[in-house]
Amino acid sequence: MDSLTHTIQTLMPKLIEWRRDFHHYAESGWVEFRTAAKVEETLDKLGFELAMGRDVIDADSRMGLPDDATLATEFARARQQGAPQKWVTAFEGGFTGIVATLNTGRPGPTIAFRVDMDALDLSEALHDGHRPHRDGFASCNPGMMHACGHDGHTT
């Protein structure tokens, strides 16, 4: 147990940094372009096999998809806000899904985790009683904020 505790303590600063980054750059459903690209980049570095975008999402099954103009505007914003260029194009048009497989080479059951990345269409509180505002990681995207923990799920 001591090694697990040590591992968690070692990872904690990076996990906090990632969560605050996702919180700061909140993106609504189907426009999580920056978030998905950051996640994809990290999973690739960790050695996961990756499938994404149109390879994992059926276009006709998406509900609540923004109009084409909104998708284009949000895609441009994600690129401006630092979405890794190598990955972001796979998600263009509202195909912000990722399937990551870690092949351990060991026999046994397959375990799946489902993680939501989208923010809510709400405005973040802008007063010092709200920790993200006070500590400088409140959403910089007006009308989008993580209010239900998906920034934590994604981390």
Go through the PLM ranges and name each one.
Residues 2-146:
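Acidic/His- and Gly-rich active-site-bordering loop/insert found
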Residues 146-155:
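Active-site alpha-helical elements of protease catalytic centers
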